[in-house]
Amino acid sequence: MKAFDLADKLIEKTKSVFNSFFDRFSDNTITYFCVGLCCALFIAGGVYCLNYEYYIYALIPVVLFGILFVIKQFKNTFLFIALLTPLAVNMSFKEVAISIPSEPILILVFLLFLWERFFTGRYEGKVFSHPISVAVIINLVWTLITCFTSEDMLVSFKYLLSQLWFIIPCFYLPIVLFKNTRKIDAFVGFYSLSLCIVICIATANFASHGFAFNFAHYSMQPFYNDHTAYGAAIALLIPPVAYYLIYGKELGFGKGKMIFVITLLVILITGFVLSYSRAAWVSLCAAFGVWVLVKSNIKLKTLIYCGLVMCVVVAFSWGRIMGAFEKNDQDSSGNMAEHISSITNISTDASNVERLNRWACALDMFKERPVFGCGPGMYTFLYGAYQKSYNLSIISTDSGDLGSTHSEYLRPLSEQGLIGLLTNTAVFVVTFVIGIRAYRRTASKLLANLALFATMGLTTYYVHGFLNQFLETDKLAVPFWGLTAVVAAIDLYATKKEKQAEKDNEKQLLNSEK
């Protein structure tokens, strides 16, 4: 006890000495001194790093500024992420690849969100009870369960963690932010602006190579790995930007804003066409089909029944469809008509044949472990053993080290079993249904159409997800979950037609009484 008392006295004595010293100076003097000391340390550190060629440490001030910005502007950080993501570049540090600067910021926001939710309680609890949120949580819970049955638990838990730092900052954080609809405008504007910068750079690269078709696959590097992810991102943004063009005047946009929106849309369409992404082209056609059906005032139940009937028809006609596809020998090319025709070539087109190879591996993995799957994130490491010689393409590797399933639906099927497929698909279906419901029920015409066009943007990825898999990357996760948050926020916070009608009736009664 005497030792503790002595320590307390020593601490108090030290405090009094420091206080008496600093009391001699004004607050401004102390501030200037601290700022000057920090500047001196940064300069000294910079000189040291330059002398010894530790150039990476020159980013420390930028990192510190980013951390300070995220902490001070926590609620608006998602808009900052939207601005940075298209311009982010993948960098490898030893065996770890990370997208700089977007992913470090996402991780920081993820940690700060957990702190704010669990230690301060500053978050609206009703968000967690919204149908889309419930579907997301169920999917994450099943992912957690399958982590314990995984072939490699460490890999699976890393995969789950990476999904959390996409979903929480890009879905749960912006839902509350989007109560202010101007923040939705800012999100779409920031992401589209950065994406258009990438498109301009990619188009310039493409032009410098004489618009050679083979270079179309790589002209967007280092910002996007290949043309498919690039095309998918553009397809996601075209419907929301088109909304601002169609309803800009009603939103009160002046000439300057309208010119800005038109410029964005023209650049997006140019990049979309020059991406030569067949899956993206098909997905945008599907989104337009949704718009036609919804504007035709067809009931939601009818749409769902039609979808189910189409699935049944395709299932029973699968043999004939595949037979027709096998007769197509048109390979992908720079000619638009030929490139579109090559979509159904499953006999000689290397990309399509390799996609079928990956799908066959995923189905075989599911058959082996139908309940829990091989574990989240494990497909990449295991699919090589399931390859059949007759399924291989000219771009296949014997070791099977080229990556993903090329499907947002077969990935959870192979990694998390049948329940994984159902919970993952449920997120898409529930969001689509809620988006159409929000369009039908929202009192504000502008917000109703915003919900519809956001749903159309998401539809492009639901369709694209049959052929590719990109939600494990920040490039697609940020706009995808951001638009999902737009749909949820409008459904959650916008005034419904029924409530608006009640308010109007009350006003009429009050006026009649007067």
State where each predicted segment sits.
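Loop-to-helix entry and N-terminal half of a specific, functionally important transmembrane alpha helix
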Residues: 260-266, 403-407, 435-467
